Amino acid sequence: MTTPGTIIFLNGTTSSGKSSVLNHLQPMLAWPFLDAGIDKFIWMLPARYLNERELWDTVLGHAASAGPLGHTLFSGMHHAIAALARAGNHILADHVLVEPIWMQECAMLFHELPAYLIGIRCPLDVIEQRERERADRTLGQARKQYDLVHAHGIY
């Protein structure tokens, strides 16, 4: 029987520093950890879904809730992370858990695996400054997510 891999799951608002933490942590870890974060799954979509209107309306929703395709995509992400870990892979993943059902689904899928859910928090003024400085961000998104992403469970 394969020993399951460890899951390190980072949750926080957009622009909170999740990807930066992941990118700094990954090369420092003793074992190879796969990057199975939210952006990797979003970029699997066909290009037509990645334009700003489709991405927000169909996939990500409007900052505080997911669009219809987002529910399917991110449920698949959660199941894929669990399957990869059960096959013995170590996983690093960052996410924006705006939907309570996503936290519940991850808890159900990861409960028999060595998994760590880590909240990435940053002061709102810092997040909003980062949001303004980055060309790929929608202004106001971080503020809408700020309290929501950490409201669905405890770390």
Predicted regions and their residues:
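Phosphate-binding P-loop
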Residues: 1-5
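Hydrophobic anchor at the beta1->P-loop junction of P-loop NTPases
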Residues: 10
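The conserved Walker
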Residues: 13-14
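Walker A/P-loop
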Residues: 19
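Conserved substrate/cofactor phosphate-moiety recognition/catalytic segment
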Residues: 26-76
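Glycine-rich phosphate-binding loop used to anchor ATP phosphates in small-molecule kinases
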Residues: 64-113
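Conserved phosphate-donor/acceptor-positioning beta-strand/loop module used by diverse small-molecule
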Residues: 110-133
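Small-molecule kinase domains that catalyze NTP-dependent phosphoryl transfer to phosphate-bearing small molecules
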Residues: 129-155
